[in-house]
Amino acid sequence: MRGLWVTAVALVFVVASALAQRDGGSQTQPVPLTFGETFTLQSEILSEVRRINVYAPPPYAQSPDTRLPVLYMPDGGMAEDFLHIAGLIQVSVGNGTMRPFLLVGIENTERRRDLTGPTQSADDKKIAPRVGGSAAFRRFIRSELMPIVNTRYRTTPETAIMGESLAGLFVVETLFVEPDLFDTYIAFDPSLWWNNKELLEKAGSRSGASGKQQRTLYLASSDEKDLSLLTQQLADRLRKNAPADLRLHYEPMPQETHATIYHPAALQALRRLFKPGR
């Protein structure tokens, strides 16, 4: 791919606390703690530079023969959801409640452009200067990002994608329009109101067999009334109309708000879907 340039640097997210010495309490110079790495790539499809953040849990470094499945996440910037999801993976792998995964966070440039499909709704078009770019974003993931990740890191063919709100909408849309792209789809409070509830209305007809042996969709919803109702309706329609090769989980979480659901829902999803030995 022309125009590719990659710069790998350590992700520095906290400065180590100074340590008191025994001889009078003097302090050492602080040193950075590193957590994963970051690189950028020039996307020809999106005509812009994109930053990618990557976390590999300890088993990856312990053996040069270790290969890991990959969990992709939109909203994957350092100031977005990357760090807290990476922390969940670190803890869950460490305490043996999930299999190790390589986490690949895609940092946003124009979130509402990338994560939404075309819309006929005038209200939808008011949320950002540009919307409806999900097909191009999907091509970027498939044709530019995935090949680079598979070249730079030791990966297995297994893939998953996780997102919340508009990113959850993108996850569900991708399952419907390109189900072979990932093995596991995880969506929290997906914005199914987009384009007059198009994905919900077409849930039965657009969830045909993918050709893979099995796919998984994990849904969770908060106490947000409209979002939880739409997510429940999607789960109900898929249970009725989805093919046999789609494994569906739906977890209502009324104790959470739209602002708080991501972290606890991700913890439950990772533990349930990626148990060791599964």
Go through the PLM ranges and name each one.
Residues M1-L4:
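Positively charged n-region of N-terminal signal peptides that target proteins for export
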Residues T7-A16:
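Bacterial N-terminal signal peptides
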Residues Q21-R278:
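Non-catalytic cap/lid and distal C-terminal segments of serine-dependent acyl enzymes
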